[in-house]
């Protein structure tokens, strides 16, 4: 099924974002106040449970149907030496995902997540966005719809991740264009490039921002001009999840960059999202601040693949277990606070 058959359909969806169920959220908050613990003593675990109650539209949210989706794409901008690895590694890692041998396989399994891997035209990289638009409008819509397609009504949680050699350059370009800031604000080592590689990334992004300066600054155009297929797919998944009231757990810098242009246009797009972690990529902390998202974890991770979000999913599962399984003061015959 095509969720966004046109740019207008995408923009209409972005302009009409459903709210959570405030009644369910209030009921969950009231339940937290009655559980056998001092109020607030479980910290953010309480907040997470209440958050999921609102978006799942039930007082006692669950994680029976939790999915991790990893999108993969290749980038034409790699011709400028912005990555430490060749583009062929993207397809090799997709094969590794499908064989069950990657970090995301182990971590999603440990967190009880169903894993879906979506490879997006790996033999057809996006264009070099420092010279032309990364994608045509049709290609960008296809990528948005590929992301939307992984979201099913009734999912309890959607964990998002990516794989794509060169995509940290695209992510930095998206952030620079979205927030009007210098490329160097967002550029980091990515897969491990040296100082010369970082300089090349900054130069490529500066040229891209200048080349596309006169183009519309809409969310769609930013994704199309300097994004990647896997990044646009994440944007499509986040938007579709909002339409279906599915809470989202975001991974690192590249994953979060996908919603930066959407958030500039519609800040409320982040309301159904949790940041799984803050990665070691320098731009991620700044991006989370711009998106007003507080990460659940900070473990120095910088792998991508949805790995940090998968670890955070185990924290979410723990939050829901406490919310559901703890006794109330009345049930346990324990005196509450006075």
Task: Pin down the residues of each PLM region.
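N-terminal loops that bind phosphate or other acidic moieties
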Residues: 1-338
């Amino acid at each position: 099924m095509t969720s966004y058959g046109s740019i207008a359909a995408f923009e209409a969806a972005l302009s009409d974002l459903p709210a959570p169920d405030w009644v369910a959220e209030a009921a969950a908050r009231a339940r937290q106040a009655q559980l056998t613990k001092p109020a607030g003593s479980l910290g953010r675990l309480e907040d997470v449970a209440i958050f999921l109650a609102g978006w799942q539209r039930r007082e006692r949210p669950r994680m029976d149907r939790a999915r991790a989706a990893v999108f993969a794409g290749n980038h034409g901008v790699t011709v400028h030496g912005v990555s430490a690895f060749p583009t062929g590694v993207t397809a090799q890692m997709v094969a590794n995902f499908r064989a069950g041998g990657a970090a995301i396989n182990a971590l999603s399994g440990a967190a009880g997540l169903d894993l879906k891997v979506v490879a997006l035209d790996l033999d057809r990289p996006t264009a070099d966005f420092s010279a032309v638009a990364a994608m045509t409008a049709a290609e960008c819509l296809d990528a948005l719809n590929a992301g939307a397609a992984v979201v099913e009504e009734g999912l309890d949680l959607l964990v998002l991740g990516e794989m794509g050699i060169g995509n940290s350059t695209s992510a930095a370009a998206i952030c620079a264009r979205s927030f009007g800031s210098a490329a160097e604000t967002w550029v980091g080592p990515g897969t491990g490039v040296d100082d010369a590689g970082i300089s090349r990334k900054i130069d490529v992004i500066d040229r891209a921002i200048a080349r596309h300066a006169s183009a519309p600054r809409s969310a769609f155009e930013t994704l199309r001009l300097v994004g990647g297929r896997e990044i646009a797919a994440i944007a499509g998944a986040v938007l579709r999840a909002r339409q279906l009231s599915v809470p989202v757990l975001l991974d690192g810098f590249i994953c979060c960059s996908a919603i930066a242009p959407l958030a500039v246009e519609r800040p409320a797009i982040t309301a159904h999202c949790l940041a799984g972690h803050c990665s070691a990529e320098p731009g991620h902390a700044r991006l989370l601040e711009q998106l007003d998202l507080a990460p659940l974890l900070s473990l120095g991770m910088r792998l991508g693949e949805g790995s940090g979000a998968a670890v955070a999913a185990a924290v979410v599962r723990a939050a829901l277990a406490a919310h559901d399984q703890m006794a109330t003061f009345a049930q346990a015959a324990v005196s509450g606070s006075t």
